[in-house]
């Protein structure tokens, strides 16, 4: 997700090319939330202008959790069908509304049907620990991959159901080490596994790297370097049906490759894309053209009012000295969370946090309602 870096495709490309990235498969669902199909098209158009390959998966879920959130625009089967006609669209982005798939929501099923009719890949997102009948139903709906696994059993379960297991190392998610043992210890066929990032903040890209960071981490976790590279290159190309164009250094494929002095440490000495040297010794050599973004798309935060300190005060019922609060429990370096309850003090009618409990607010920014939750 390019937007997680708070960057445009051009600036994201400029950040990752020196780290050896020559192809990306992206899902711009954040821009879809804000600008709908037109925003996705602008992101896609800028992506297609870059000196490396940036392919787009059409976002599937805007909103991702219908009934629980509001978005500036909504995506449906009509938008998906339209996007499938664009050059460079490789499939449907992660199907986050997994309850909708499990319960045969017509909208979700139609989006996947439009994608499969175009002979393209349906991305998965099964963020539930239940690997029983609901999981089987989700896979039967059409999702062909998933990156929400956090344990070895998750990776094995996905591969057993015919999916490709995407193991991620992003800025906040560290799920490779806990899953790669499915290959290194259990001996599953590495062709069914893909290394990915999911979300990377710009600081991670600058200071730590991109896919080179993920490959190095996999090697550090005991993976054979060649298999780690396989899971970051040809496996991905095969998954998206592009192995005849890229993913290997072979005749007829795009001349995308890196030059490195060590396959174990993977220093990126030079980067070639489409036969041209685009980076050398950490320095970007290629130009990354920018799309001419209209002024209107730069002014999409519509709060409807000026925010005041009192908007973020949590009031308690009169007479209470403490209150039982619902708290989101963070699991370090994982996407799943825990549903917790804490007794928090009330002072002068206001709930106070203590210890490592923090306030959390949601400000509606699309429709100018002024709502702060």
Regions found by a protein language model. Name each.
Residues 10-121, 185-188:
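Divalent-metal coordination cores built from histidine and acidic residues
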Residues 206-222, 226-373:
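Active-site microenvironment of metallo-dependent hydrolases
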Residues 74-94, 100-167, 174-195, 206-227, ...:
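Histidine/acidic residue-rich metal-binding segments in metalloenzymes
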Residues 1-3, 29-31, 59-64, 94-98, ...:
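Active-site beta-loop-alpha junctions enriched in small/polar residues
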Residues 20, 43, 92, 158, ...:
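Divalent metal-coordination and catalytic microenvironments
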Residues 5-7, 27, 57, 125, ...:
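Structural motif
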Residues 1-13:
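Di-metal (Zn2+ and/or Mg2+/Mn2+) metal-binding site signature of metallo-dependent hydrolases
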Residues 57-59, 196, 361-363:
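Short beta-strand segments
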